[in-house]
């Protein structure tokens, strides 16, 4: 069965998420308020056992609000890891995260819900990244650090 993904948002980040999801073999539907046939508010009609959701908004707080809304409605969140990214088997990545090309999440690190680990970002060992964080392009987080929720670095 084909994996189904609902992407919420069609801006720059939404298009980036779409590219990654295609490479991972998802069948994709995009919801956005600019599309009268597929507005964001229609997300509940897509909830089923075979469908995952990813809110693709650059605004950290708005993205996490949508994560909570999807969970409260009974939807499942995806976690997307680009094939060229490295996530240690001893790291933990929560739901709703997107790990973009060339990124590294090293051993013992924990990534909270709804985080963006952008192109080429490096998360060294034993880092704690709280919910809703965006690590920007080529960001480096040294080992044993903590990044507070909603931070953009």
Task: Give the ranges of each region predicted by the language model.
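Phosphate-bearing ligand-interacting subdomains
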Residues: 18, 35-86
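Structural signal for interior beta-strand "rungs" in well-ordered beta-sheet cores
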Residues: 80-153
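Generic non-transmembrane alpha-helix signal with a bias for helix starts/N-cap capping motifs
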Residues: 14, 63, 126-127
């Amino acid at each position: 069965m084909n994996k189904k993904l609902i992407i919420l948002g069609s801006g720059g980040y939404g298009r980036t998420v779409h590219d990654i999801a295609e490479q991972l073999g998802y069948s994709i539907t995009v919801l956005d308020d600019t599309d009268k046939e597929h507005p964001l508010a229609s997300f509940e009609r897509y909830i089923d056992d075979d469908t995952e959701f990813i809110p693709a908004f650059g605004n950290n707080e708005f993205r996490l609000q949508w994560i909570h809304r999807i969970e409260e409605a009974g939807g499942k969140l995806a976690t997307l890891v680009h094939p060229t990214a490295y996530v240690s088997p001893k790291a933990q990545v929560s739901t709703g995260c997107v790990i973009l090309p060339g990124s590294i999440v090293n051993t013992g690190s924990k990534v909270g819900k709804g985080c963006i680990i952008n192109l080429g970002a490096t998360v060294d060992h034993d880092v704690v990244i709280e919910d809703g964080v965006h690590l920007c392009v080529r960001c480096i987080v040294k080992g044993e650090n903590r990044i507070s929720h909603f931070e953009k670095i």
